[in-house]
Curated annotation (Swiss-Prot):
Organism: Afipia carboxidovorans (strain ATCC 49405 / DSM 1227 / KCTC 32145 / OM5) (Oligotropha carboxidovorans)
Name by which UniProt lists this protein: Bifunctional protein FolD
Domain of life: Bacteria
UniProt-listed Enzyme Commission number(s): 1.5.1.5, 3.5.4.9
One annotated GO biological process: methionine biosynthetic process
Organism lineage: Bacteria, Pseudomonadati, Pseudomonadota, Alphaproteobacteria, Hyphomicrobiales
Catalyzed reactions: (6R)-5,10-methylene-5,6,7,8-tetrahydrofolate + NADP(+) = (6R)-5,10-methenyltetrahydrofolate + NADPH; (6R)-5,10-methenyltetrahydrofolate + H2O = (6R)-10-formyltetrahydrofolate + H(+)
SUPFAM superfamilies per record: Aminoacid dehydrogenase-like, N-terminal domain, NAD(P)-binding Rossmann-fold domains
Keywords of this entry: Amino-acid biosynthesis, Histidine biosynthesis, Hydrolase, Methionine biosynthesis, Multifunctional enzyme, NADP, One-carbon metabolism, Oxidoreductase, Purine biosynthesis
Amino acid sequence: MPATRIDGKAIAAKLREDVAAEVARLKRDHDLTPGLAVVLIGNDPASEVYVGSKTKQTVAAGMASFEHKLAADTPQAQVLALIARLNRDPAVHGILVQLPLPKGLDATIIVNAIDPAKDVDGLHPVNAGRLASGLPALTPCTPLGCIILAKTVHASLEGMNAIVLGRSNLVGRPLVQLLLNENATVTIAHSRTRNLPALCRQADLVFAAVGRPEMVKGDWIKPGATVIDVGINRLPGEGGKSRLVGDVAYAEAMEVAGAVTPVPGGVGQMTVACLLVNTVRAACAIKGLSAPSV
């Protein structure tokens, strides 16, 4: 029997509805409008699309959106000055600098300049450290989305064997911490891991975030496992057009797994929705309010 297709698009839409309801409550009860500032440097086409989507969804949720577009040759000192101004702005509760940055700009220095309380990408070392310590923290959006998707299949992840393929600071490492906080038993794998297919076959939960098209084959997957595919890879398609695939061989996985996220229509849909969640959480924390329901 084919696996269940995890509909990230529908789950993200429901999450955005919940965020909009929470924003309306904050406006009504506390005169608080969560505000998100997005900084886009340069004219990378993919980044422009991402920022446009973030701005549109922020406004649709009833939040304040502040978009700052800078030229690719903007000096780093000017970028840091903008971030310092946003850190002080009481109308801004979340700050996101769209990555990757143009050459000549140091992403580490720029990200670390963001006030950790407004770091809705969850990349500041303070938030990474709090997450690793099991303390409340703003969490990177994609790993947060992965956990939400997995919990639509399993009410609890406690005691489950999970494997995370990929150890990036953006996805793999924070995802491991989130899984540990859920009391899952976690293996983290990477390019140097030995016997990777055998390790995958032991996992109840497989999270693929390696950036290698269709690397995870059907015979890597334990029957009935849940597979969350974070990869977004573009391959040549018919008629000179390209096609998007994940890090998992989707058709093969559907014949073995219990549930699988598609690409597109899976994890990617959750990332912006979780950015909205983080912005609302940041706004409540900054204003000294109890944690929101989303």
